[in-house]
Amino acid sequence: MTAVEGEPASVELADASRWYGNVVAVNDISFRLEGGVTGLLGPNGAGKSTILHMVAGFLAPSSGSVTVGGSPSWRHPEMYRRIGLVPEREAVYPFLTGREFAVAMARLHGMEPAAAAEAAARAIGLVELEDAADRAIGTYSKGMRQRAKVAAALVHDPPILLLDEPFNGMDPRQRLHMMELLRGMAAEGRTILFSSHILEEVERLAERVLVIVAGRLAASGDFREIRRLMTDRPHTFTLRSSDDRALASALLAEPMIAGAALDGGLLTVRATDFGAFSRAVSGIARRHAIRLHELLPTDESLESVFSYLVRR
């Protein structure tokens, strides 16, 4: 790929919302991107795909604005040449070979046949699909189809790349290569926005994170800040011991404990510091001659973390 000349292409949402009938998919979101890799992190159904499709010009915002390089992306064909989109859905033709698919996408961007063939070969090489380039896409694995979609998005060398759950179906080696490829393109000046519901993917790749929950922007910043918000939230644990009532009394004397309750033979504890509580609880039990039988965190799913970020 060639380095992007001039300033990085900007992507901006200003009070952007999108609804379908009575369903609000994106609710009054604002952010601005200029170069680098940004991760859209959120549970399935949070509105990440809708945001990407509005930036790509496939959907109009119901209110607010979505601009690319200062111009609206909706119904602006010139913008399409500046954007490469990797959708989550299976947007490939199984009867075409990988090479034919990439060439077709290049031709749709106005390239002459010779230039399209050259661009397709370059894009296929970038995603390491050369060995399967002349096989029908219908014979590809899920990870190979993902790479074919990425090649199609790169074929016209766009300054902006939008990827919706791009690592689905890829094996660990393919994921590592794709992350290195995206980092390299960002270093050349491109603006890259990708979605994921997997925390580790975003942590490894993104310089900036946008946390989306129920169509709202719950948090944004670098990953250290997002991690701090996630770690510092209250955590709920369930415990079973030889004497739950005595353990509850002992725990409530600790500054890290925000609350404790006994219900149906189960002790539920709220702690303000996950790590400190996990390290200290066994020692507290021993000091009071209590045998600890079970300790389980009950709210460690991403959905619970995201819900906390929305409520804070």
For the regions a protein language model found, what residue spans apply to each?
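Catalytic Walker B motif of ABC-type/P-loop ATPase nucleotide-binding domains
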Residues: 161-165
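Conserved ABC ATPase "signature" region
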Residues: 103, 107, 114-132
